[in-house]
């Protein structure tokens, strides 16, 4: 009888990937990136281990959503104080902090526990085309062509 092999933490080979978010649909980009962060693109995927790779997302300020979402999609946060609820539309948040839109979409697709927080730390999002991770030589990650907004 064959036994299932579980990769050790030392044997996990982490790659760096670069994703250009320009003219990409938010949800379709987020699902692909979340899958790579979890390690589901590897043969050594194990649900209870962080086998994922690092992902650098650039041009977060040029991400797209469909329909009326730019005016109707709301992002909520709370300061923890009474009356501390803040509500912002997609358009306003994109002008102020475009990285947060991509981060929030991807974080919601990762496990909601300590392992998910560890996976989320491997995500790096930047609003422009520049990023400080050139030394890691990130490879371009090919996304599904359907993810490109028309």
Swiss-Prot record:
GO biological processes: negative regulation of translation; translation
Q: Which cysteines are joined by disulfide bonds?
A: none
Statement: the UniProt record of this protein carries the keyword Ribosomal protein? yes
Q: Pfam families, alphabetically?
A: Ribosomal_L13 (PF00572)
Q: Name one GO cellular component term.
A: cytosolic large ribosomal subunit
Q: Where is this region: Disordered?
A: 129-150
GO molecular function annotations of the record = mRNA binding; structural constituent of ribosome
Keywords assigned by UniProt, alphabetized: Ribonucleoprotein, Ribosomal protein
Write down the CDD domains for this protein, in alphabetical order: Ribosomal_L13 (cd00392)
Its domain of life reads: Bacteria
Q: Note the InterPro entries from the entry.
A: Ribosomal_uL13, Ribosomal_uL13_bac-type, Ribosomal_uL13_CS, Ribosomal_uL13_sf
Please tell me whether the keyword Transcription is annotated for this protein.
Answer: no
| Assembly with partners or alone | Part of the 50S ribosomal subunit.
Free-text function comment from the UniProt entry = This protein is one of the early assembly proteins of the 50S ribosomal subunit, although it is not seen to bind rRNA by itself. It is important during the early stages of 50S assembly.
Q: Which family does it belong to?
A: Belongs to the universal ribosomal protein uL13 family.
Tell me what this protein is called.
Answer: Large ribosomal subunit protein uL13
> What species was this sequence derived from?
Synechococcus sp. (strain WH7803)
Q: Give the lineage.
A: Bacteria, Bacillati, Cyanobacteriota, Cyanophyceae, Synechococcales
């Amino acid at each position: 009888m064959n036994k299932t092999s579980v990769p050790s933490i030392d044997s996990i080979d982490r790659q760096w990937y670069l994703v250009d978010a320009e003219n990409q649909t938010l949800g379709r980009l987020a699902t692909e990136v979340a899958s790579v962060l979890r390690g589901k693109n590897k043969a050594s995927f194990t649900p209870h281990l962080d086998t994922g790779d690092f992902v650098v997302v650039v041009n977060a300020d040029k991400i797209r959503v469909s329909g009326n979402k730019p005016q109707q999609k709301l992002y909520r946060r709370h300061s923890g104080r009474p009356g501390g609820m803040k509500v912002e539309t997609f358009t306003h948040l994109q002008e102020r902090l475009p990285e947060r839109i991509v981060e929030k979409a991807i974080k919601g697709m990762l496990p909601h526990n300590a392992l998910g927080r560890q996976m989320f730390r491997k995500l790096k999002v930047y609003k422009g085309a520049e990023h400080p991770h050139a030394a890691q030589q990130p490879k371009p990650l090919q996304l599904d062509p359907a993810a490109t907004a028309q």
